[in-house]
């Protein structure tokens, strides 16, 4: 089925409490508002039938809806009446007291086209709901190819990634979230990294029974305002631009006119097809049972002093300058220094890899001589093995080259490169390091592999091509994997280097000692370098904090990934 050229999509934002009948009426009212705005598709929030708060399993089952019951029949009737596609998320009875959190799609004739169960549950949802046992196919409609997911599914990468790889043009995300970083990070990054549209509908108003707001706030030290839906429902373009956003605190419907076909061209500015260069054969660990592949126990330092060093000179002249700067910062205590991609090549471009090997070796020798006090330098340089030229993230110490991680994904910008065959890690006195050279960091699977392998720190010597890489992409690599990250690039129109570290207090609904709860779910501490030319940028990161990946009870950001539903990620998929 061919998508129409322009589609008006809408996200409806409203509150849903304990009264199923009132929530039902609210759904119908907001659908009517979307229809008044001439929407072709409207997405409603998660748990539109009842607040996600239950006395026990019996209560959870009682307030859930039947797929063929009156609640959803009325939604379908509204779809037919308004000639409108609708996505609504409800708790659904599955028999024998089993309940799922399910997104249901109706077409403009009122027919139910899909029912997609939530893959990643958070906190107490695990006590009452069954997570998805199968994936929901992409749905071909006259509007385009639609994929459905819900809230926590999008806080980590696997569910949206699988939908995009299966061909979705538009991802419909129903949320029930207090988290301020949904709108600022987790929603827009899924559009950009997959080059698809995202229509995300969140709630406003209390997420728990109003009578319990003050008692729960007192018991958990979570301010009452963060027990409400964070709103900011939004529609995001494939380049990560937020086209429209609702306010935080009131009912609203937001609209945008989009061309779903724009999501089908996956080429980056240099001509690289971001999906075609994927390496599913390398991603197998993502689809393996975490219980059968536990992260090895290890010790990591509480703190690590890091620095990004960028040259003012270009080409071969940058080697001496950078060596002097490395000597300075390592003598002053920097333990890990990361340099921009191909820092000693004009414009970050290698025109002749054979000559590039020679210049890279000169750089390695100079940097080794500059390393002080046991420090290491990560640089992006030309390496050679088995007849292959590589673009590698190299780790250099006082004794010279210690280790190299070849770039894993082909890039038109570095057409001379033969990609490597695995993501590996390097153990250092302060912890475990992974390096993503070239454009590897735009692929969420690469950082995921690093986290599964037990890395605490991720070094990224790179050159961005798209604004989202610095705005949300690298931040999400840190957030969804609970990794410290040091990203080095030449300052330019898209931004400059950044460093992320992790909060000590992290797990929601546990006692926090070092800071008050701020409404962020997994957003790391981000320090950005000045956008103007700055030779040295210093920061402190906390490797040991990467060991806690439990964002809420029974919800581990890495071990809790939907590994059993990852076939679209680990097998070559069509996205034509």
What function would you assign to each model-found segment?
Residues 89, 174, 201-202, 380, ...:
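Generic beta-sheet signal
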Residues 10, 87, 147, 199, ...:
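Structural detector of well-ordered beta-strand residues that form the stable sheet scaffold
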Residues 20, 25-115, 177-196, 213, ...:
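Cys-nucleophile CN-hydrolase/nitrilase-fold catalytic domain and related Cys-dependent amidase chemistry
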Residues 2-17, 296-316:
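Short beta-strand segments enriched in small/hydrophobic residues
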């Amino acid at each position: 089925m061919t998508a129409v050229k322009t589609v008006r999509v809408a996200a409806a934002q409203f509150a849903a409490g304990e009264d199923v009948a009132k929530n039902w009426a609210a759904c119908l009212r907001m659908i009517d508002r979307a229809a008044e705005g001439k929407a072709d598709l409207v997405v409603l929030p998660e748990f539109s039938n009842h607040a996600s708060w239950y006395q026990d399993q019996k209560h959870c089952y009682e307030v859930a809806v039947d797929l063929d019951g009156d609640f959803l029949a009325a939604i379908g009737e509204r779809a037919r009446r308004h000639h409108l596609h609708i996505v609504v998320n409800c708790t659904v009875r599955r028999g024998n007291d089993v309940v799922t959190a399910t997104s249901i799609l109706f077409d403009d004739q009122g027919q139910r086209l899909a029912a997609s169960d939530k893959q990643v549950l958070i906190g107490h949802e695990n006590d009452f709901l069954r997570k998805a046992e199968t994936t929901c196919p992409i749905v071909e409609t006259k509007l385009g190819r639609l994929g459905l997911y819900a809230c926590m599914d999008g806080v980590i990468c696997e569910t949206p990634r699988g939908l995009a790889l299966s061909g979705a043009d538009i991802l419909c995300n129903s949320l029930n979230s207090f988290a301020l970083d949904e709108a600022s990070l987790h929603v827009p990054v899924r559009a950009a990294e997959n080059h698809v549209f995202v229509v995300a509908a969140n709630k406003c108003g209390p997420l728990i029974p109003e009578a319990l707001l003050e008692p729960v706030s007192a018991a958990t030290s979570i301010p009452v305002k963060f027990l409400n839906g964070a709103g900011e429902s939004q529609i995001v373009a494939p380049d990560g631009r937020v086209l429209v956003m609702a306010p935080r605190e009131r009912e609203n419907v937001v609209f945008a006119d989009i061309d779903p076909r724009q999501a089908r061209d996956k080429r980056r500015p240099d001509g690289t097809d971001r999906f075609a260069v994927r390496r599913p054969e390398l991603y197998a660990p993502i689809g393996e049972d975490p219980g059968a592949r536990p992260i090895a126990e290890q010790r990591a330092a509480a703190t690590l002093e890091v620095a990004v060093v960028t040259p003012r000179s270009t080409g071969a002249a940058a080697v001496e300058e950078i060596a002097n700067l490395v000597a300075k910062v390592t003598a002053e205590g920097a333990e890990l220094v990361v340099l921009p991609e191909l820092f000693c090549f004009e414009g970050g471009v290698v025109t002749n890899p054979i000559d590039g090997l020679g210049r890279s070796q000169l750089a390695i020798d100079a940097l080794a001589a500059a390393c002080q006090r046991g420090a290491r330098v990560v640089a992006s340089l030309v390496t050679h093995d088995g007849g292959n030229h590589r673009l590698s993230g190299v780790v250099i110490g006082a004794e010279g080259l210690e280790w190299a991680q070849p770039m894993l994904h082909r890039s038109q910008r570095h057409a001379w490169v033969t990609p490597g065959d695995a993501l590996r890690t390097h153990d250092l006195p302060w912890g475990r390091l992974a390096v993503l050279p070239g454009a590897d960091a735009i692929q969420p699977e690469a950082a995921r592999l690093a986290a599964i392998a037990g890395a605490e720190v991720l070094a990224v010597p790179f050159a961005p091509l798209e604004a989202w890489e610095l705005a949300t992409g690298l931040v999400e690599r840190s957030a969804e994997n609970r990794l410290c990250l040091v990203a080095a690039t030449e300052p330019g129109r898209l931004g400059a280097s950044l460093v992320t570290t992790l909060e000590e207090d992290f797990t929601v609904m546990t006692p926090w000692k070092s800071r008050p709860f701020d409404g962020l779910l997994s957003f790391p501490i981000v320090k950005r370098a000045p956008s103007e030319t700055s030779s040295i940028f210093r920061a402190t990161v906390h490797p040991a904090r990467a060991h806690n990946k439990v964002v809420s009870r029974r919800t581990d950001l890495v071990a809790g990934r939907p590994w059993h539903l990852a076939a679209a990620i680990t097998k070559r998929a069509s996205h034509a």
